[in-house]
């Protein structure tokens, strides 16, 4: 009888634990997961490539969020929600990253987004290549080259 009472308490508890919020385990980032160093930006129309390999500009993917950050701290950082569909990376809901005063939703393009290879407020990129060490994204205007950090 005592065993039945214990099991009647423990089994529902285990069920609740296994079915609880899954935000931490949902990984929409898939192969994009982690930190990527932006090493160059190629302007497709001109063929001009800007070398950023000595800069500290990073895209970091985790769960459903993307953080754009210049590690010097001299340029604004940004947050995006993202979705991947058929090798298309769609960025939405851009925020100015400001932990001290609260993040601010962007309603207009900011020129400092260009530092990260972003040329419009909510771009869509084609994932041209991705493996454990390299990633190439293309939005039709620029091609972004990344190394996994």
Q: Which residue ranges define each predicted feature?
A:
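Edge beta-strand at a domain terminus
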Residues: 79-87, 130-149
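Short, hydrophobic/aromatic-rich segments at coil-to-beta transitions
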Residues: 33-35, 62-67, 130-136
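Contiguous, well-ordered beta-strand patches that form the walls/edges
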Residues: 42-53, 64-130
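Bacterial N-terminal signal peptides that target proteins for export
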Residues: 1-10
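N-terminal helix-cap/turn-to-beta initiation motif at the start of protein domains
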Residues: 22-37
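C-terminal motif of bacterial Sec signal peptides marking the signal peptidase cleavage site
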Residues: 17-20
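Residue-level signal for mature regions of secreted extracellular proteins and peptides
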Residues: 11-15
């Amino acid at each position: 009888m005592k065993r039945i009472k214990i099991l009647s308490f423990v089994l529902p508890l285990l069920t609740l634990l296994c079915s609880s919020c899954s935000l931490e385990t949902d990984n929409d980032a898939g192969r994009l997961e982690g930190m990527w160093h932006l090493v160059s930006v190629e302007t497709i129309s001109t063929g001009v490539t800007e070398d950023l390999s000595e800069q500290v500009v990073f895209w970091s993917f985790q769960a459903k969020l993307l953080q754009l950050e210049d590690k010097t701290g001299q340029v604004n950082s940004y947050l995006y929600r993202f979705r991947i569909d058929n090798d298309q990376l769609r960025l939405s809901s851009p925020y100015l990253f400001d932990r001290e005063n609260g993040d601010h939703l962007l309603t207009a393009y900011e020129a400092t987004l260009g530092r990260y290879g972003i040329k419009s407020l909510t771009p869509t990129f084609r994932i041209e290549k991705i493996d454990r060490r390299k990633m190439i994204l293309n939005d039709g205007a620029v091609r972004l080259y990344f190394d996994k950090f």
